Design a protein with these regions (language model features):
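Short, conserved beta-strand/beta-arch hydrophobic-aromatic motifs that form part
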Residues: 39-96
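Well-ordered alpha/beta subsegment
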Residues: 89-123
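Charge-dense, low-complexity intrinsically disordered segments
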Residues: 14, 18, 99-102
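Residues that form generic nucleotide/phosphate-binding pockets
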Residues: 12, 30, 111, 115
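A short, surface-exposed helix-loop junction/capping segment
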Residues: 1-16
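Amphipathic alpha-helical segments
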Residues: 17-38
Length: 123
């Protein structure tokens, strides 16, 4: 279930190159297929955050101009995430990766599953 309007977000996604849209759609379909997952589009309609039991475990921001997807994954060691893509810290918001290689989707889904499973506790 998506909370919040996503028309502008969908326009943003459709401005991305086809391979970026396919990466996003593949990961999105995987995540929303997991039990107890809700999503929310941010206020600027630039990204989608995924929640389990009210706790976020992933955020994806497709970037049409840069031709990559910014992904933030909760609870997975940055060294493990580095196996998929280089971790880049944003000011006040560390541990983002920029995904543009469709060949990394399977590994990324594995890490997202770890983040999803980490959200069963009370953190």
């Amino acid at each position: 279930m998506t909370i919040g309007g996503d028309e502008e977000f969908m326009r943003r996604l459709h401005r991305c190159p086809e391979h970026i849209r396919k990466i996003f759609q593949s990961i999105d379909a995987y995540l929303v297929g997991l039990d107890d997952v809700t999503t929310r589009i941010d206020k600027k309609q630039e990204g989608r955050t995924y929640y389990r039991g009210g706790k976020w475990f992933c955020r994806m921001d497709p970037k049409p101009v840069e031709a990559w997807i910014g992904v933030r994954i909760h609870g997975v060691d940055p060294a493990v995430i580095e196996t998929v893509a280089k971790v880049r810290d944003r000011p006040n918001d560390p541990h983002w990766i920029f995904v543009k290689d469709p060949g990394k989707v399977t590994d990324l889904k594995r890490m997202l599953r770890m983040a999803y499973e980490s959200r069963t506790g009370s953190d």
